C-alpha cells in the first residue's frame, strides 16, 4: 500500500478519537430520572409548607378562619366580642350596639349564617357579661358604677351592711377610667392586699378612727379562732362569765295563744220505727198505772 495513504489513515483515526460522541438515553432511564425529580420537588414543597405552618404557629398568628366549621371558631369569636365590649365600656363607650356593628368593629363580618344565628339567639343572650337592650348588646359589669361618687356610695353601702370591700379588678371592669376616679377619692378609701396579691377597696369611715393600745392589739392578734365555730366561742364566753348581746337585750314576748272554744255537741237523732202505724197505735200507760 502506498505510504501516503497509510499516513492519511492514521491521521483520520486520531481525529476520530479526539472528537466527543453523544449517545441517546434509553426510555427506561429517562422515566426513572423524571420520577426521582418529581419526588424531590414534592419533598421540597412539603417541607416548605410545613415550615410555613410551624413558623405561623410559632409567631402566634393563628387564623380563626381555619376552624370555621368547628366549635372552637364559634367560641373564639364569642370571646373576642366579649373582650371588645369590655374594653369599649372601660373607655367610656357604654351605648349598646347591634350585632352587625359589633361584627364590623371586631372584623368578623365574614362569618357564616349559622354562627351569626348562634350568636344572636344563644351565645350573647345567655352570656352573663352581655345584656340585651332593645335588640342591641352592651357590656354588663358586676357593679353598676358610672362615676367616682357612685363608687364611694357603693363602698359605703358595703361597709354599712357588713359586706366588706370590693375587688379592684371588679371596679376597673365596671367604672370607665377607673384609675382617675380611684386617685381622685384619695384618703376616702382604703387598699388592702390579699395573700393572692389581689387588691381590695374599703370605705374609709373616719368616724370610726380612734387610737387603740398596742398591747391590746397584740392580744387581739394573738387569739386564734380559726378552728372554732360560733357555738364553741359562745360556750367559752359563758364559762368566762361574759354574756352575749342577745341575752342582755330586750327579750321578745311570745304571743298569747288563745284557746279554741270546744265545738257544741249536736243532739243525737234516733231513728223511730213503725212510723207508718202512728195513727193506729194507742197508749195504755194510764191504765197500767191505776192498777
Swiss-Prot record:
Subcellular location: Nucleus
N-acetylmethionine modifications at: 1
One Pfam short name: TFIIE_beta
GO MF, one example: RNA polymerase II general transcription initiation factor activity
Biased composition regions of type Basic residues, renumbered to the chain: 257-271
Phosphoserine: residues carrying this PTM: 61
Biological-process GO terms, alphabetical: transcription by RNA polymerase II; transcription initiation at RNA polymerase II promoter
Gene3D superfamilies (alphabetical): Winged helix-like DNA-binding domain superfamily/Winged helix DNA-binding domain (1.10.10.10)
Post-translational modification N6-acetyllysine, affected residues: 74
Family classification: Belongs to the TFIIE beta subunit family.
Alphabetized PANTHER family for the sequence: TRANSCRIPTION INITIATION FACTOR IIE SUBUNIT BETA, TRANSCRIPTION INITIATION FACTOR IIE, BETA SUBUNIT
Designated name of the protein: Transcription initiation factor IIE subunit beta
Organism of origin: Homo sapiens
Gene behind the chain: GTF2E2
Amino acid at each position: 500500500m502506498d505510504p501516503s495513504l497509510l499516513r492519511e489513515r492514521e491521521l483520520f483515526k486520531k481525529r476520530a478519537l479526539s472528537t466527543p460522541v453523544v449517545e441517546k438515553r434509553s426510555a427506561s432511564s429517562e422515566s426513572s430520572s423524571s420520577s426521582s425529580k418529581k419526588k424531590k420537588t414534592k419533598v421540597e414543597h412539603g417541607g416548605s409548607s410545613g415550615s410555613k405552618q410551624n413558623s405561623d404557629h410559632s409567631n402566634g398568628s393563628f387564623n380563626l378562619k381555619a376552624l370555621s366549621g368547628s366549635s372552637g371558631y364559634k367560641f373564639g369569636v364569642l370571646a373576642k366580642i366579649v373582650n371588645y365590649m369590655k374594653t369599649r365600656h372601660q373607655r367610656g363607650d357604654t351605648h349598646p350596639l347591634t350585632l352587625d356593628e359589633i361584627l364590623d368593629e371586631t372584623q368578623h363580618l365574614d362569618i357564616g349564617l349559622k354562627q351569626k344565628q348562634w350568636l344572636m339567639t344563644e351565645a350573647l343572650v345567655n352570656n352573663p357579661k352581655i345584656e340585651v337592650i332593645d335588640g342591641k348588646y352592651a357590656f354588663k359589669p358586676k357593679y353598676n358604677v358610672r362615676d367616682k361618687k357612685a363608687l364611694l356610695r357603693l363602698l359605703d353601702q358595703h361597709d354599712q351592711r357588713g359586706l366588706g370591700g370590693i375587688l379592684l379588678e371588679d371596679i376597673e371592669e365596671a367604672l370607665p377610667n377607673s384609675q382617675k376616679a380611684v386617685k381622685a377619692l384619695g384618703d376616702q378609701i382604703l387598699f388592702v392586699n390579699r395573700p393572692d396579691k389581689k387588691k381590695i377597696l374599703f370605705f374609709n369611715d373616719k368616724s370610726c378612727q380612734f387610737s387603740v393600745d398596742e398591747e391590746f392589739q397584740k392580744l387581739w392578734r394573738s387569739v386564734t379562732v380559726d378552728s372554732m365555730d360560733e357555738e364553741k366561742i359562745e360556750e367559752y364566753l359563758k364559762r368566762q362569765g361574759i354574756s352575749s348581746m342577745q341575752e342582755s337585750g330586750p327579750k321578745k314576748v311570745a304571743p298569747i295563744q288563745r284557746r279554741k272554744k270546744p265545738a257544741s255537741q249536736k243532739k243525737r237523732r234516733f231513728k223511730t220505727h213503725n212510723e207508718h202505724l202512728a195513727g193506729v197505735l194507742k197508749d195504755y200507760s194510764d191504765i197500767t198505772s191505776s192498777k
